[in-house]
């Protein structure tokens, strides 16, 4: 046996026992010829003492991160030398045997938790970073999150199924990571962007309740909150409606927060329509930890003399106490808005006597000035920010301003948890209103994906008014972060055909890209729906981390680069030839590239 006890498990009750420990030297101190080391293993730290004589002599050569095996007697620390900060603070181990299992080179950075170390350096030596308490704790918490979810789902008779990670390239919005098929030169596998189509096939196969902690891959341009490979808790259920999926989602989320954060989520979690979220908060991911809301002012300024406010949409958001901001701070708000692609952020200052000032106020009519404070819910001393233009971008700007105001004014309780379901999402959006890759060649693209079912009010007539058609789609939001989302799927072939026609996807194109799914749907598919939770983001929130990278064992940095292994890296000419990278298959007639899943948060594919 390499060791008899874990270092962090020792307590006063072990006093008098002989123990053998194994771990790393976290700290070494020399006090008048007596050597003290903090021996660290996965369980914690124990203080080991090498008294004068041979043991102290042998301990002199020990350095940080030497890997040791030590035998000694557990004794209580002298009175006054206890350390209440650690679980083993009442005892120490007097060493009688020492074995150096391996030595350590000088460290590239100190492993002290209290010292700041650059992220690139930490990721390059991630194996050392994981010896620190914070990263190690995040990994253990993530393992616990997996266990909790599995317990909930197994308790409901769900079946954990592993779907392929080498599959056919199917259009799902982002680019695929491709793998050459060596035995079939010119042909390629793709790594899955999600298990979406396979989990629907499992429902056709009669499994009824499926889940998977799934690895997914998207070859996207770098974004700060994304990783090219990520994890989602993927779920699909047969014979369910939207309420059934939401109820299961709430049980999972409640169990996670209760068992890892000690927080009991009030249930049922409130619901808000997509339209309401956009109108009140300027986003479909509203942070409800504070109550500041947008006010639409389009009708109020319908006859305004101010040319800037003669726009399809005018909205406002109030900054409490913002009238006291100096001019340079108000100018900084303009720079803030321009960084988000806007021309600026109009504002009106409300004086303590109720008078309005600022560059916008003088351009308003007397009637507009007189009623403005009441219309937006402002008070003396407040600043009112405005955005005018198209509805989508103006709301987005005000929504971002709302969050910035919340931070600057201390309105957000960072110890609070606030959850909301956003439901009744639009089924389609015009290709003119999105930067996403168009779905098919029609005027409309799917907001979620083209297998999302229209809701009961729209299933028979969505073609008549695509702009207002609503889907059985739902996202769950925590503190302004989308942590999961899904939909009820189309299981009727006639409805699926009509959706494809509206999106401009021909029958030939549909068969070429995902004919295997359409073929399966000929054989009595059940009504089904599901959800996918963004596992990395959930773990980040539960760990109180600032970045997804903090809760991933070996994350990528900017642009998908791995500082640890140097991936991606070139391959040799021989590897390239053997893999058939340059082989060209015979072109198929009518083989057109269609994007079916718009780029976006992976949970939307759930």
Curated annotation (Swiss-Prot):
Sequence segments annotated as region (Aspartate): 196-199
CDD domains listed in its UniProt record: AspRS_core, EcAspRS_like_N
GO molecular function terms noted in the UniProt entry: aspartate-tRNA ligase activity; aspartate-tRNA(Asn) ligase activity; ATP binding; nucleic acid binding
PROSITE patterns membership: AA_TRNA_LIGASE_II
Residues of the site described as Important for tRNA non-discrimination: 31, 80
Reaction(s) the record says it catalyses: tRNA(Asx) + L-aspartate + ATP = L-aspartyl-tRNA(Asx) + AMP + diphosphate
Subcellular location(s) per record: Cytoplasm
Pfam family, one: tRNA_anti-codon
Ligand binding (ATP): 218-220, 227, 482, 534-537
GO biological process, one term: aspartyl-tRNA aminoacylation
Keyword Nucleotide-binding: yes
Source species, domain of life: Bacteria
Keywords assigned: Aminoacyl-tRNA synthetase, ATP-binding, Cytoplasm, Ligase, Nucleotide-binding, Protein biosynthesis
Binding site for L-aspartate: 172, 218, 448, 489
Any one GO CC term of the record: cytoplasm
Record bears the keyword rRNA-binding: no
Quaternary structure, from the entry: Homodimer.
PANTHER family registered for this protein in UniProt: ASPARTATE--TRNA LIGASE, MITOCHONDRIAL (PTHR22594:SF5), ASPARTYL/LYSYL-TRNA SYNTHETASE (PTHR22594)
HAMAP family listed in its UniProt record: Asp_tRNA_synth_type1
NCBIfam families: aspS_bact, PRK00476.1
Described purpose of this protein according to its UniProt entry: Aspartyl-tRNA synthetase with relaxed tRNA specificity since it is able to aspartylate not only its cognate tRNA(Asp) but also tRNA(Asn). Reaction proceeds in two steps: L-aspartate is first activated by ATP to form Asp-AMP and then transferred to the acceptor end of tRNA(Asp/Asn).
Protein's name in the database: Aspartate--tRNA(Asp/Asn) ligase
Record organism: Saccharopolyspora erythraea (strain ATCC 11635 / DSM 40517 / JCM 4748 / NBRC 13426 / NCIMB 8594 / NRRL 2338)
